[in-house]
Curated annotation (Swiss-Prot):
UniProt organism field: Lacticaseibacillus paracasei (strain ATCC 334 / BCRC 17002 / CCUG 31169 / CIP 107868 / KCTC 3260 / NRRL B-441) (Lactobacillus paracasei)
Main subcellular location: cytoplasm
GO molecular function list: ribosomal large subunit binding
Cystine pairs: none
Function comment: Responsible for the release of ribosomes from messenger RNA at the termination of protein biosynthesis. May increase the efficiency of translation by recycling ribosomes from one round of translation to another.
GO BP: translational termination
UniProt-recorded name of the protein: Ribosome-recycling factor
One Pfam family cited in the UniProt record for this chain: RRF
SUPFAM superfamilies the record matches: Ribosome recycling factor, RRF
Length: 185
C-alpha cells in the first residue's frame, strides 16, 4: 500500500511534466512548429473539428507552416478559424493551401516569452511539491494507523523526495530547452 502511494505520486508527477510540455509547446518560439495549431478548432459541417483532423500541417521552411486541407471546400472555414485564433499570425490562402509565416521575434518579446516559460515551470514545480506533500501526508497517516513502521516511513519519505527531485530536475531541463529555443536567433 505504501509503495502504491509513491508509485501514484510518480505517475502524477509525470502527468505534470506532460502538461508542462503541452503548455510550452503552445508558446511560439520564432520558428514553425505544428503544435502551435493543436488548439485550433474549425466549424466543419456544423460541428467543431480539430484542425489537425481536417488538414495536413507541414513545415516547408523554418518559419512557415503550411495547412493542406483534405477537403478543399473547408479551406475558407480553416482560414476563418485561423484568423479568429489568438495566434497573431495572418494566414495566406492561395486557393489550395494556407501558409502561416511565423514573424521573427524581437529581443524584448523573447525576454517576455522566457519569463512566461519560467512562470509555467514554476507552476509545475509547485504542483510537484503539492503531490509530494499529499503523498507524505498519506504515508504519515499509515504510520500513525500502524500500517507501516517508523523506519519504513523514513525510507519511503526518502523515496518520495528522490522522486520529487527527479521530477523537478526534468522540469528544469524542459524549461531550459524551451528557453534556449526561444533565445536562439
Amino acid at each position: 500500500m505504501a509503495n502504491q502511494i509513491i508509485d501514484q505520486a510518480k505517475v502524477n508527477m509525470g502527468k505534470t511534466e506532460e502538461s508542462l510540455q503541452r503548455e510550452l509547446g503552445n508558446i511560439r518560439a520564432g520558428r514553425a512548429n505544428a503544435s502551435l495549431l493543436n488548439q485550433i478548432t474549425v466549424e466543419y459541417y456544423g460541428a467543431p473539428t480539430p484542425l489537425n483532423q481536417m488538414a495536413a500541417i507541414t513545415i516547408p521552411e523554418p518559419r512557415v507552416l503550411q495547412v493542406s486541407p483534405y477537403d478543399k471546400s473547408s479551406l475558407k472555414n480553416i482560414e476563418t478559424a485561423l484568423n479568429a485564433s489568438d495566434l497573431g499570425i495572418n494566414p495566406a490562402n492561395d486557393g489550395d493551401v494556407i501558409r502561416l509565416v511565423i514573424p521573427q521575434l524581437t529581443g524584448e518579446r523573447r525576454k517576455e516569452i522566457a519569463k512566461e516559460v519560467g512562470k509555467y515551470s514554476e507552476s509545475a514545480k509547485i504542483a510537484i511539491r503539492n503531490i509530494r506533500r499529499e503523498g507524505l501526508d498519506k504515508l504519515k497517516r499509515q504510520e500513525k494507523d500502524g500500517d507501516i513502521t517508523e523506519d519504513d516511513l523514513h525510507r519511503l519519505e526518502k523515496d518520495m523526495q528522490k522522486a520529487t527531485d527527479d521530477a523537478t530536475k526534468r522540469i528544469d531541463e524542459i524549461a531550459a530547452a524551451k528557453e534556449k529555443e526561444i533565445t536562439e536567433v
